[in-house]
């Protein structure tokens, strides 16, 4: 251990959470959810990867932890794991996460129609991470023998000044989400069960310490989703879903995509005439679905793939000279090149999915499920690696 600073591994976390529901009226509920998490982590500055690597590669008997007079031991090309753990400084990371949601739910059963509700919700999440790395490169030695008086003689391995350096990093995110939905669920004549939902959502994610000018732009998306279901005596099932989603990653005219899906099911084991065999086969259901989903995260680390990016510091061809203070008095000027070619026609990557399946329950104890599915993807965005001749 080092008496100048604390490099020991430690982790502390503090949590706070509260959920409050307030009945504003008999049919109106205001909900507030707030949670906070604060963590502090301390560790050696060298990092776990370096420590484990050197521990596995160094011969245990090559050098001691320290020499008897307290001198730090090491050998050329292979740092002493003891020094990495105790003598290279420390890293301290503190982070906090705050999450909050406010919602308002209204039940319209008494004055519009039974089973109709609406809900709006707003949430704000914030994260902050601050890291302090205080590193030091100590002087290390290797014993090469003893003098006539029995004192250890050393050769210098690392002749560093031993000063502590400071390196800091900061990161954080801000996430805003708004949702508004209308829901309807009702059963008629003990046989017909219907439900419907329409949901609008809008999201925005921003970084407090963006690493590039592209990352400084908030990540935004919005969309509308809808679902309708129907079942008859819990035997016949039908469901329709759709999403109409918008993404910032595409050019105007291509930002929104429509993705529908439909599913049907038949619970044959709920038929009255199935009762004689229900002790053996208690569940038998056939189901099928067909629909599409979209993916807008198609550019990897690249955003706004519809825009062409320009490099103003291209090397290679010289396009002129300008005066400078060198001996020649001039320096060449590079040109402008295209870094990434934009594609204004790029749009949602779409996956068309189809599925048929069966669910089987035996003896009220064993359930078997089998599915056959097909997934076909279209509109996959690829970067051309070479230009055809």
Task: Label every model-predicted segment.
Residues 67-69:
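Amphipathic helix-loop-helix modules that constitute alpha-helical solenoid scaffolds
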Residues 62:
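Conserved functional hotspot residues at active sites or interaction interfaces
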Residues 1-10:
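Surface-exposed beta-strand-turn/loop segments characteristic
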Residues 10-14, 256-259:
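Short, conserved loop/turn and helix-capping segments at secondary-structure boundaries
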Residues 19-38, 42-48, 53-57, 73-135, ...:
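Extracellular/periplasmic, surface-exposed regions of secreted and cell-surface proteins
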Residues 140:
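Active-site-proximal polar cores
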């Amino acid at each position: 251990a080092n008496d100048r600073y604390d490099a020991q591994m430690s982790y502390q976390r503090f949590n706070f959470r509260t959920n409050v529901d307030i009945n504003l009226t008999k049919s109106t509920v205001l909900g507030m959810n707030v949670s906070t998490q604060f963590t502090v982590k301390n560790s050696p500055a060298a990092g776990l990867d370096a420590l484990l690597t050197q521990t596995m590669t160094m011969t245990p008997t090559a050098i001691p932890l320290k020499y008897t007079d307290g001198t730090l031991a090491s050998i050329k090309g292979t740092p002493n794991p003891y020094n990495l753990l105790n003598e290279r400084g420390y890293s301290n990371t503190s982070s906090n996460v705050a999450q909050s949601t406010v919602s308002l739910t209204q039940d319209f059963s008494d004055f519009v129609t039974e089973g109709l509700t609406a809900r709006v919700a707003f949430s704000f999440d914030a994260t902050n991470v601050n890291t302090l790395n205080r590193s030091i490169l100590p002087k290390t030695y290797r014993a090469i023998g003893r003098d006539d008086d029995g004192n250890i003689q050393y050769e210098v391995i690392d002749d560093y000044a031993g000063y502590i350096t400071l390196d800091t990093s900061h990161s954080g995110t801000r996430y805003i989400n708004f949702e508004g939905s209308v829901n309807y669920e009702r059963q008629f004549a003990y046989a017909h069960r219907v439900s419907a939902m329409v949901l609008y959502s809008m999201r925005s994610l921003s970084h407090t310490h963006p690493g590039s000018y592209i990352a400084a732009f908030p990540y935004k998306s919005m969309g509308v989703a809808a679902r309708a279901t129907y079942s008859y005596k819990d035997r016949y099932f039908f469901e329709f879903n759709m999403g109409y989603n918008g993404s910032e990653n595409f050019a105007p005219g291509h930002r929104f995509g429509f993705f529908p899906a439909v599913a049907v099911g038949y619970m044959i084991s709920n038929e009255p005439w199935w009762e004689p065999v229900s002790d053996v086969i208690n569940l038998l259901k056939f189901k099928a679905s067909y629909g599409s989903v979209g993916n807008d995260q198609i550019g990897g680390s690249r955003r706004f793939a519809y825009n062409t990016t320009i490099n103003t510091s291209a090397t290679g061809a010289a396009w002129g000279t300008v005066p400078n203070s060198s001996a020649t008095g001039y320096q060449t000027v590079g040109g402008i090149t295209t870094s990434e070619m934009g594609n204004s026609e790029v749009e949602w990557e779409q996956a068309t999915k189809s599925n048929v399946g069966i669910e089987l329950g035996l003896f009220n104890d064993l359930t078997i499920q089998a599915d056959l599915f097909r997934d076909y993807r279209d509109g996959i965005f690829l970067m051309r690696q070479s230009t055809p001749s």
